[in-house]
Curated annotation (Swiss-Prot):
Keywords: ATP-binding, Coiled coil, Cytoplasm, Cytoskeleton, Endosome, Lipid-binding, Membrane, Microtubule, Motor protein, Nucleotide-binding, Phosphoprotein, Transport. Belongs to the TRAFAC class myosin-kinesin ATPase superfamily. Kinesin family. The lineage of its organism: Eukaryota, Metazoa, Chordata, Craniata, Vertebrata. Changing L1248A: Induces a 7-fold decrease in PtdIns(3)P-binding and abolishes endosome localization. Induces a 25-fold decrease in PtdIns(3)P-binding. Transmembrane segments: none annotated. Plus end-directed microtubule-dependent motor protein involved in endosome transport and receptor recycling and degradation. Regulates the plus end motility of early endosomes and the balance between recycling and degradation of receptors such as EGF receptor (EGFR) and FGF receptor (FGFR). Regulates the Golgi to endosome transport of FGFR-containing vesicles during early development, a key process for developing basement membrane and epiblast and primitive endoderm lineages during early postimplantation development. Residues 1036-1048 have a biased composition (Polar residues). It comes from Homo sapiens. The modification Phosphothreonine is found at T577. Residues 478-529 form the FHA domain. GO terms for molecular function: ATP binding; ATP hydrolysis activity; microtubule binding; phosphatidylinositol-3,4,5-trisphosphate binding; phosphatidylinositol-3,4-bisphosphate binding; phosphatidylinositol-3,5-bisphosphate binding; phosphatidylinositol-3-phosphate binding; plus-end-directed microtubule motor activity. It is found in: Cytoplasm, Cytoskeleton; Early endosome membrane; Cytoplasm; Cytoplasm, Cytoskeleton, Spindle. Residues 1036-1057 are annotated as: Disordered. The gene is KIF16B. This is Kinesin-like protein KIF16B. Changing K1232A: Induces a 3-fold decrease in PtdIns(3)P-binding.
Length: 1317
């Protein structure tokens, strides 16, 4: 028995959970999984603390939520942990089952099936199974046969995923066999030879599987899928036949789901109900089986009746053996890490925890006949043993023993014969399976025989023939004749008028030709032939007078089927032609078969059949007699066994007497061995005493020698001590020299890296500029003219519709003009749809080109990275090589441009896929819907036309905004390039300073080294060493005092640095003032134009012209200030150098300050660039866009009133509120008292009559819309208004507008058109 193995796997956060800002609540440690309830406060003790976190222990816990984590578990690791056991169990003969359980979107299908780049458990298990089969068959250790089937359970109905479309697609029934358990009736089983066959069937099944998109998952499995592998293996194990059959169920379950979370309705809701029903039943089965297992383990507890509801769902019925039956089962519980799915995750973990307690009873599935052979062999071996024991005692010459030996020999011969038959059967099976050109598959209750080669199928007129004869026509020539021919014939036939060498079938490149030989009788489709004839699919061939065949050519038939599908060949005419040909051929052939000859052959066959029947009866009689003889022999063996038991009892008595005698002898032997051991111990003790004396003498001698050596070493060390001190100081100076050189080299590299970064920054901005230009070209490619034409057409249609509406209001309805206007609108939509379709094709073609370019850039980048890695590894091996060190940065510089190009292409592709193409598809879908709905009412048509006009206006405004943004970006790029040139001058000066310092340090170190060398030579001449050491110490002290003086200089440098930072802040403030002046110029230009269209058309040229005058002025001031600051800093640095700043510590401090200053300048410039990029000129011209697209009727009876939908857009924020006319009037009265400028605005007057007339309401809508636009235009320019552009700038937002007036604030009832605003 074995319990169900349970593994838990957590997936990463998906996009939906990230949008909801979900928290991570799953932690895993080895086999433990912990879930945290964030709704319970942290820090609780007792029950509340335990309720906050719950810990479960499983067989395996797989953490797959973060690929960067060291505990990350990939698909490959999951297979190695679980899949290898499944493959091993299959080869051992056990059934196995793997299924994934969890809520929808938790990663079940990914774990089981995977995706194209990362296969799941099911493909990996199949691949592992066949790889092991190939390893085994390579050494001819065993034979194998593998069948697969693939089904899905959709809405509690079983469907065969590998069957062709038929009427029985969802009508497969589930039955239960008394011994083999549940099975699916008429489920197709497919024989496979390798993993490629399995993969092909799996892909075909996955295409047919039912999936759909839900609110929680884009591709959600709407059915349970079971992929079953029936694996049979046969081999000889120690000369014993062995045949096992294993079934592997690989299950991909649909996920449990809640209707409110997925947003399911209609069919999706019904599917979800059936999915939840089967999963609830699965949970009930798991609970019941866990209770049964716990009752079985607790023997003292009272047994209770537990019912396992297998048949409550099709899923649990088919998995009956896998749950608590004959199978080794693995359950993978997939969970989400987000707190928004806490309830579903906890439920999954609890079910998985209960499944651990299920106890299965797996057994090896051995073939019944093989099992019988093995048991018979065991019985023969046992009888042989008994017979041998009996012969040794008293039955050596008895007739009973001789008779028993004879019967045993007969049984052995019979076992050998059965084994041989079993071996021949498997050899034939393997030969058929290895034949790649012939495939046998089951189709319903029938069997289909598929062949790849051209072949002949025999049409036998013998009524007693039961087989199907198929002859392959191999490449080359196939000879046909009788068995008495002089040469061996490939196809041997018998019959009237058949020559010994009759004809030849020649197959050259798939073209088959029939060549009759020397007067032989051959007919094709009833026509006698005497020369080579080309054969076509379906031809009927007669050889002689009695051998008829049908010729099949699979490739030619496939081509004909394709033609029939494409309409080139009518199926009706093709079938009638085939029928007529078959009828003519058969009738022509029957002319050659006389009735008498047929009756004679039939009588001969009946006589043969009668003789065979008699032979069978004789064999049955013989078998009965053999069976009776075997029973008699078994009775004799039983009596012999009883006699043998008596003899064995006598032998045991004799063995006991022998044991007593041997015990006495062993005691004597032990006494002798004890005396011998005593003697050996005395001899060893004497030897040890002699060795101890010898060892003491050796130790004393060794100590004396060691003392003498120690004295000599001390003398030698005293002589070397003074020399060692000098060398140590020399090494210390050398180290300091190397450190100084290393630091200077680092400074040089830092300056070079700064230069590269600045160049890359300029290149990046240039890339952005080019990207924006191409993006605008992409959007403007003929679209502006097209949009303007459509807008003009829509204005004409709208005028016609308004005339019809005015005529209807006056009581004079013109139906013909309404119909013409609607026809014009529909014709406009058709033209628009055609243009959209053409544009979609262009975009799709452009998308393919971009994908191809991205793939090429990725390949180039991978090649460059591989070369860079190889050179890096070579540099690690050869660090001392100076020439190799410069090659790696050069390779890195090659990689950077390729990465930028790749990022640019990917951004282009992403913009096309996420923005342009979806917008186009949405517009095309809207056009389709309008055309499908047909003619609309006047109001609906007018609403659609006005909506289209508003969209066209927004598109034109967007095009103008992109053009303005491109001009701004180009100005920013020029500004940044100018800054980069000034930075280049600063870096050159800094490099010159570093080189001069490096030269001074090198000279100082060379002088110190020369002094030490002189000291060493003086020591060699035995001069006074103490004076030299004291002199060097005094020099070092003087150096230390010099360093203290340099610290004062360092303080002054820091003060200068602070002053420099203050000047830079002043510079930034001046730049900000210049930008503010540009914004004010934009505001002045905007005041000169009345309408939105006029502003967009006429304000772009003056603003750009003014900006072009201001930008050079701003650049000139910045350049002058930077140049002045550079010169001042260089003078300060030269002054510090002249005063003696030469030590390494001070040098490093200065360089660090220089580096920090450069970084600060760079960050400051980047901030200025980012600000300039973030400011959209079009947004500053028209930051608030407001419109009233429609009005709706709310309330009933006396409370009925019209509400206007007000759509407000502030920069990139858009929202909608519904307000009635009285709210507009209240806002105007309230704000008019605060801001006098509003009194000059014209507010739509109140009317006593006609307030519910739609014509009046339509006019009021346009008046209110104009009022709101004028209202914001005044407020943005008013100095007393909180919305003034100089006060808010880019901080203008939805919050600012709502704080200005509650009229624009969205209330509780503003989320639909049924509010009371």
């Amino acid at each position: 028995m074995a319990s169900v193995k349970v593994a838990v796997r957590v997936r990463p956060m998906n996009r939906r959970e990230k949008d909801l800002e979900a928290k991570f609540i799953i932690q895993m440690e080895k086999s433990k999984t912990t879930i945290t309830n964030l709704k319970i406060p942290e820090g609780g003790t007792g029950d509340s603390g335990r309720e906050r976190t719950k810990t479960f222990t499983y067989d395996f816990s797989f953490y797959s939520a973060d690929t960067k984590s060291p505990d990350y578990v990939s698909q490959e690791m999951v297979f190695k942990t679980l899949g290898t056991d499944v493959v091993k169990s299959a080869f051992e003969g056990y059934n196995a089952c793997v299924f994934a359980y969890g809520q929808t979107g938790s990663g079940k299908s990914y774990t089981m099936m995977g995706n194209s780049g990362d296969s799941g458990l099911i493909p990996r298990i199949c691949e592992g199974l066949f790889s092991r089969i190939n390893e085994t068959t390579r050494w001819d250790e065993a034979s194998f046969r593998t069948e697969v089937s693939y089904l899905e359970i959709y809405n509690e109905r079983v469907r065969d995923l590998l069957r062709r479309k038929s009427s029985k697609t969802f009508n497969l029934r589930v039955r239960e066999h008394p011994k083999e358990g549940p099975y699916v009736e008429d489920l197709s089983k497919h024989l496979v030879q390798n993993y490629g066959d399995v993969e092909e069937l799996m892909d075909a099944g996955n295409i047919n599987r039912t999936t759909a998109a839900t609110g929680m998952n884009d591709v959600s499995s709407r059915s349970h899928a079971i992929f079953t592998i029936k694996f049979t293996q046969a081999k000889f194990d120690s000369e014993m036949p062995c045949e096992t059959v294993s079934k592997i169920h690989l299950v991909d379950l649909a996920g449990s789901e809640r209707a409110d979370a997925t947003g399911a309705t209609g069919v999706r809701l019904k599917e979800g109900g059936n999915i939840n029903k089967s999963l609830v039943t699965l949970g009930n089965v798991i609970s019941a089986l866990a209770d049964l297992s716990q009752d079985a383990a607790n023997t003292l507890a009272k047994k209770k009746q537990v019912f396992v509801p297998y048949r409550d769902s099709v899923l649990t019925w088919l998995l009956k053996d896998s749950l608590g039956g004959n199978s080794k089962t693995i359950m993978i519980a997939t969970i989400s890490p987000a707190d928004v799915n806490y309830g579903e995750t906890l439920s999954t973990l609890r079910y998985a925890n209960r499944a651990k307690n299920i106890i299965n009873k797996p057994t090896i599935n051995e073939d019944a006949n093989v099992k019988l052979i093995r048991e018979l062999r065991a019985e023969i071996a046992r009888l042989k043993t008994l017979l041998a024991q009996g012969n040794q005692i008293a039955l050596l010459d008895s007739p009973t023993a001789l008779s028993m030996e004879e019967k045993l020999q007969q049984n052995e011969a019979r076992v050998q014969e059965l084994t041989k038959e079993w071996t021949n059967k498997w050899n034939e099976t393997q030969n058929i399976l290895k034949e790649q050109t012939l495939a046998l598959r089951k189709e319903g209750i029938g069997v289909v025989l598929d062949s790849e080669l051209p072949h002949l199928i025999g049409i036998d007129d013998d009524l007693l023939s039961t087989g199907i004869i198929l002859y392959h026509l191999k490449e080359g020539q196939t000879y046909v004749g009788r068995d008495d021919a002089s040469t061996e014939q490939d196809i041997v036939l018998h019959g009237l008028d058949l020559e010994s060498e009759h004809c030849i079938f020649e197959n050259i490149g798939g073209t088959v030709t029939l060549i009759p030989l020397s007067g032989s009788q051959c007919s094709v489709n009833g026509v006698q032939i005497v020369e080579a004839t080309h054969l076509n699919q379906g031809a009927v061939i007669l050889l002689g007078r009695t051998n008829m065949f049908r010729f099949n050519h699979p490739k030619e038939a496939a081509k004909l089927r394709e033609k029939r599908k494409s309409g080139l060949l009518s199926s009706f005419s093709l079938s009638m032609t085939d029928l007529s040909k078959s009828r003519e051929n058969l009738s022509a052939v029957m002319l050659y078969n006389p009735g008498l000859e047929f009756e004679r052959q039939q009588r001969e066959e009946l006589e043969k059949l009668e003789s065979k029947r008699k032979l069978i009866e004789e064999m049955e009689e013989k078998q009965k007699s053999d069976k009776a003889e075997l029973e008699r022999m078994q009775q004799e063996v039983e009596t012999q066994r009883k006699e043998t038991e008596i003899v064995q009892l006598q032998i045991r008595k004799q063995e006991e007497s022998l044991k007593r005698r041997s015990f006495h002898i062993e005691n004597k032997l032990k006494d002798l061995l004890a005396e011998k051991e005593k003697f050996e111990e005395e001899r060893l003790r004497e030897q040890q005493e002699i060795e101890l004396q010898k060892k003491r003498q050796e130790e004393e001698t060794f100590l004396r020698v060691q003392e003498e050596l120690q004295r000599l070493k001390e003398l030698n060390n005293n002589e070397k001590a003074e020399k060692f001190q000098i060398f140590q100081e020399l090494d210390q100076l050398q180290k300091e020299k190397d450190e100084q050189y290393a630091k200077l080299e680092l400074e040089k590299k830092r300056l070079e890296e700064q230069e590269k970064e600045q160049v890359m920054l300029v290149a990046h901005l240039e890339e952005q500029l080019r990207e924006k230009q191409e993006m605008i070209q992409l959007l403007r490619r003929g679209e502006v003219q097209w949009v303007e034409e459509e807008k003009r057409d829509l204005e004409g249609i709208r005028e016609s519709l308004l005339r019809v509406k005015e005529a209807r209001a006056g009581g004079d309805e013109d139906g013909e003009e309404l119909e013409k206007a609607q026809l014009r609108f529909f014709e406009f939509k058709r033209r628009q749809l055609v243009k959209l379709v053409n544009l979609e094709k262009d975009l799709v073609q452009q998308k393919d080109i971009l994908k191809k370019e991205v793939q090429e850039e990725q390949e180039i980048l991978e090649c460059l990275k591989c070369e860079h890695d190889k050179e890096s590894r070579l540099l690690e091996k050869h660090d001392e090589s100076v020439t190799d060190v410069t090659e790696v940065p050069q390779d890195f510089e090659k990689i950077k441009p390729v990465e930028y190009r790749l990022q640019y292409k990917e951004r282009q592709l992403q913009y096309l896929l996420q923005n342009h193409l979806p917008t186009l598809l949405e517009e095309k879908q809207r056009a389709f819907e309008i055309l499908d709905r047909g003619p609309l009412s006047l109001d609906n048509t007018l609403y659609q036309v006005e909506k289209e006009m508003e969209e066209k206006e927004e598109q034109l405004a967007q095009y103008q905004a992109n053009a303005n943004q491109l001009q701004k970006l180009q100005a920013t790029f020029e500004f940044t390039a100018n800054i980069a040139r000034q930075e280049e001058k600063v870096r050159k000066k800094e490099k010159e300073i570093l080189e001069s310092r490096e030269k001074q340090q090198r000279e100082a170190l060379e002088r110190a080294l020369a002094r030490l060398e002189r000291r060493h030579s003086a020591l060699q001449r035995h001069s006074t060493l103490g004076m030299e050491i004291e002199e060097q110490r005094q020099k070092l002290a003087s150096l230390n005092s010099g360093s203290r003086e340099q610290s004062g200089l360092q303080a002054s440098l820091e003060a200068e640095q602070e002053a420099l930072e203050k000047d830079q802040e002043r510079l930034e403030y001046e730049i900000q003032q210049l930008k503010q002046k540009i914004y004010e110029v934009d505001g002045v230009q905007k005041d000169h134009h009345g309408t939105l269209e006029g502003k967009v058309a006429s304000s772009s040229l003056p603003v750009s012209a003014e900006k072009s005058h201001l930008v050079p002025l701003m650049d000139a001031r910045i350049n002058a200030y930077i140049e002045e600051e550079v010169q001042r800093r260089l003078q300060d640095l030269h002054r510090v150098i002249s005063e003696g700043c030469s030590t390494s510590a001070d040098t490093m401090k200065d360089n660090e300050k220089l580096h920090n200053g450069t970084i600060q300048r760079k960050l400051k410039y980047e901030r200025m660039v980012s600000r300039s990029l973030g400011a959209n000129p079009d947004d500053l011209k028209d930051p608030i866009k407001i419109s009233i697209p429609r009005y709706v009727l709310c309330g009933q009876g006396k409370d009925a009133h019209f509400e206007f939908e007000v759509k407000i857009t502030v920069l990139d924020e858009t929202w909608t509120v519904f307000r009635r006319y009285s709210r507009f009037r209240e806002m105007h009265k309230t704000l008019k008292l605060k801001y006098a400028e509003l009194a000059a605005l014209e507010f739509p007057p109140k009317k006593l009559f006609g307030n519910k007339d739609e014509r009046v309401i339509a006019e009021r809508r346009s008046h209110l819309e104009k009022y709101l636009r004028d209202f914001f235009s005044v407020m943005l320019q008013s100095a007393t208004s909180p919305l003034h552009i100089n006060k808010v700038g880019l901080t203008l937002s939805k919050h600012t507008i709502c704080e200005f007036s509650p009229f624009f604030k969205k209330g509780v009832f503003d989320y639909s058109s049924h509010g009371t605003g």
